From Swiss-Prot:
<comment type="similarity">
    <text>Belongs to the short-chain dehydrogenases/reductases (SDR) family. FolM subfamily.</text>
</comment>
<dbReference type="Pfam" id="PF13561">
    <property type="entry name" value="adh_short_C2"/>
</dbReference>
<keyword id="KW-0554">One-carbon metabolism</keyword>
<keyword id="KW-0560">Oxidoreductase</keyword>
<dbReference type="GO" id="GO:0004146">
    <property type="term" value="F:dihydrofolate reductase activity"/>
</dbReference>
<protein>
    <recommendedName>
        <fullName>Dihydromonapterin reductase</fullName>
        <ecNumber>1.5.1.50</ecNumber>
        <ecNumber>1.5.1.3</ecNumber>
    </recommendedName>
</protein>
<dbReference type="InterPro" id="IPR020904">
    <property type="entry name" value="Sc_DH/Rdtase_CS"/>
</dbReference>
<dbReference type="GO" id="GO:0006730">
    <property type="term" value="P:one-carbon metabolic process"/>
</dbReference>
<keyword id="KW-0521">NADP</keyword>
<comment type="function">
    <text>Catalyzes the reduction of dihydromonapterin to tetrahydromonapterin. Also has lower activity with dihydrofolate.</text>
</comment>
<dbReference type="InterPro" id="IPR036291">
    <property type="entry name" value="NAD(P)-bd_dom_sf"/>
</dbReference>
<feature type="active site" description="Proton acceptor">
    <location>
        <position position="152"/>
    </location>
</feature>
<dbReference type="InterPro" id="IPR002347">
    <property type="entry name" value="SDR_fam"/>
</dbReference>
Amino acid sequence: MGNAPQRPILITGGGRRIGLALAHHFLTLRQPVIVSYRNEYPSIEGLRQAGATCIQADFSTDEGILRFAETVKSNTRGLRAIIHNASAWQAEKPGTPLSETLACMMQIHVHAPYLLNHALEELLRGHGHAAGDIIHFTDYVVERGSDKHIAYAASKAALDNMTRSFARKLAPEVKVNAIAPSLILFNEEDDAEYRQKALNKSLMKIVPGEKEVIDLIDYLLTSCYVTGRSFGVDGGRPLN
């Protein structure tokens, strides 16, 4: 058993922002990583050079999701964790059919984690008590809704609910939790006015950066007891 290879952590949407930071964090710890990505970024080549297994995937169809799952299975016989980071933020807007917006949000935030959790369940099980993890990235809007991103908020709320359902299904071998962030990082194109307005929405008045999320994930992965819970990383924003 001591010579058994480490099981990789699977991170969906690992080519940018939090997913990318997580991948590099684990690689620094000599933890094997598999990342999914849709578009080729320079960061993907950097991950490859650092030792990550990078798999291009299209989650816009169920077939693409299941094809990705089969590729993962061909690369490893076990998984330490699945971190569902892949996301899209699409608002209702004139010219785009509402049904299309809803379908897109449900596809990436509900179909993908639902199908992957089922398809890869066997890779997470069989390694002992609380030896596997699934982490869903939801959003603080699950609590309050959103008048401009209704489909997005609804899809993240569905993912939040699935956290508890999968926790019931997979315990005690696999823990399943959710992280509900608000503003973690600015985009480069965000101007000063937008940044100040965004900062004022939280009680803590800062942008914490990826480390706040990384530290929480490290805690969840090392816990032997916490499952079926959602953790807000929002600076008290729902209270403001």
